[in-house]
């Protein structure tokens, strides 16, 4: 019995090995046979998970790259200011008869005694203390060249940045943020002469103490709606007056006949 049992085991082992070799030959290249998949199911699942992770990482990297390219394009685009920090109005210079700073579509900058469409300006903040000035009608920015000449620019550049300062007399001065005298470090200011023409900022006569550089902002303030409300004040009730105790009226006394006694003196 023992020999027959051993022979059966030997033949069964041979049959199984031959069947396994045949399956390997029939399977295509690069794909494991069923025996291999049955033997190592964990390995196949790990490979599948790694392949899915690689695909997800590549998919996530592609939108990131696209966003990066978009961000670089936005940085290269022109300056855009937020609409929340804008002030729309005019800048009035009290030099001479008084002029409103105006910007023309052809790039000319001067002053007009009467306010008009060209004198409607929009002042927006660029950074701390630095502002930009744009003409609403001309849609161009006030700029100062390297020679100190005022002109209008279609694009917002560093020449369009001005430093805004508040003076003691409630007027403002606007000096170029990048251009100044190299030797002395004197700033170049936006100024108008008595005839309403723009002065050169590099001129030694253009000083922050002179009225030609003083501008009064005249902004349109939006009318706030009238808020009406009623307040009900509770009426204070007067405390009840204390009740005076009733004093019983005493009955009138009857006049009793008074007896008069006479003193009698006895002598003797």
UniProtKB/Swiss-Prot annotation:
GO molecular function: fibroblast growth factor receptor binding; growth factor activity
UniProt keyword list: Disease variant, Glycoprotein, Growth factor, Mitogen, Proto-oncogene, Secreted, Signal
Pfam families xref list: FGF
Localization: Secreted
Residues carrying a glycan: 110
Record family assignment: Belongs to the heparin-binding growth factors family.
InterPro entries xref list: Fibroblast_GF_fam, IL1/FGF
Tissue specificity remark: Expressed in neonatal brain.
PROSITE patterns: HBGF_FGF (PS00247)
Assembly, per entry: Interacts with FGFR1 and FGFR2. Affinity between fibroblast growth factors (FGFs) and their receptors is increased by heparan sulfate glycosaminoglycans that function as coreceptors.
Record keyword Secreted present: yes
Gene Ontology CC annotations of this record: cytoplasm; extracellular region; extracellular space
Compositional bias ranges of the Low complexity kind: 43-80
Protein name: Fibroblast growth factor 5
Origin organism lineage: Eukaryota, Metazoa, Chordata, Craniata, Vertebrata
Start and end residues of each stretch annotated as Disordered: 26-81, 233-255
Gene Ontology biological process terms from the UniProt entry: cell-cell signaling; fibroblast growth factor receptor signaling pathway; glial cell differentiation; nervous system development; neurogenesis; positive regulation of cell division; positive regulation of cell population proliferation; positive regulation of MAPK cascade
Organism superkingdom: Eukaryota
Function text: Plays an important role in the regulation of cell proliferation and cell differentiation. Required for normal regulation of the hair growth cycle. Functions as an inhibitor of hair elongation by promoting progression from anagen, the growth phase of the hair follicle, into catagen the apoptosis-induced regression phase.
Natural source organism: Homo sapiens (Human)
Signal peptide start and end residues: 1-20
Disease: Trichomegaly: A morphologic trait characterized by unusually long eyelashes and mild hypertrichosis of eyebrows. It can be observed in association with corneal irritation, cataracts, and hereditary spherocytosis.
